[in-house]
Amino acid sequence: MSKKEVIIYTDGACSGNPGAGGWAAIILFQDYRKDIYGREENTTNNKMELTAVINGLKVLKFSCNINLYTDSLYVKHGITEWINKWKMNGWKTSNKKSVKNMELWKELDNVASQHEIDWKWVKAHSGDKYNEEADSLARKAIIDA
């Protein structure tokens, strides 16, 4: 049986950095759509971007082929370029400092390993329908305490 083809759009937002933050993921499968979002206090934009991706992937019950869209180069470069070096270096950066948001990166690495993911970067606020909607949901999460 072939894997299901899924599209996920994610976004994170912060009111102040650090400050109250929101995250959102839009999961698209055939004609099905699921929106998830949440809020955290005293967080950062990067933590919210990572949380959005993690929670979007956790919704999936089976191993899938995923096109995952993020407007965060931090997330895209982290998962596609930096993470293997961090793991080889004991979760240290090239400057020998601990990786920021290490626990979230470890969790993302774990949930991402269950799927085939094509990581795609989309420019924020460029008119991409689902990126704009994910942004709106993440911002709504901050307000809807």
Swiss-Prot record:
Report whether Ribosomal protein shows up as a keyword of the record.
no
Keywords, comma-separated and alphabetical: Cytoplasm, Endonuclease, Hydrolase, Magnesium, Metal-binding, Nuclease
Q: Does the keyword Nuclease apply?
A: yes
Q: Where is the RNase H type-1 domain?
A: 2-143
Q: What's noted on cofactor binding?
A: Binds 1 Mg(2+) ion per subunit. May bind a second metal ion at a regulatory site, or after substrate binding.
The GO terms this record gives for MF are: magnesium ion binding; nucleic acid binding; RNA-DNA hybrid ribonuclease activity
Cofactor(s) listed in the protein's UniProt record: Mg(2+)
Q: Where in the cell is it found?
A: Cytoplasm
Name any Gene Ontology BP term: DNA replication, removal of RNA primer
Residues that bind Mg(2+) 1: 11, 49, 71
Instruction: Offer one Pfam family short name for this entry.
Output: RNase_H
- Major subcellular location class: cytoplasm
Which residues are listed for Mg(2+) 2 binding in this entry? 11, 135
Reactions catalysed according to its record: Endonucleolytic cleavage to 5'-phosphomonoester
| Entry's EC annotation | 3.1.26.4
Q: Name one GO cellular component term.
A: cytoplasm
Q: Which family does it belong to?
A: Belongs to the RNase H family.
| Assembly, per entry | Monomer.
Record-linked PANTHER family: RIBONUCLEASE H1
What is this protein's function per UniProt? Answer: Endonuclease that specifically degrades the RNA of RNA-DNA hybrids.
Protein's UniProt name: Ribonuclease H
Q: Which gene encodes it?
A: rnhA
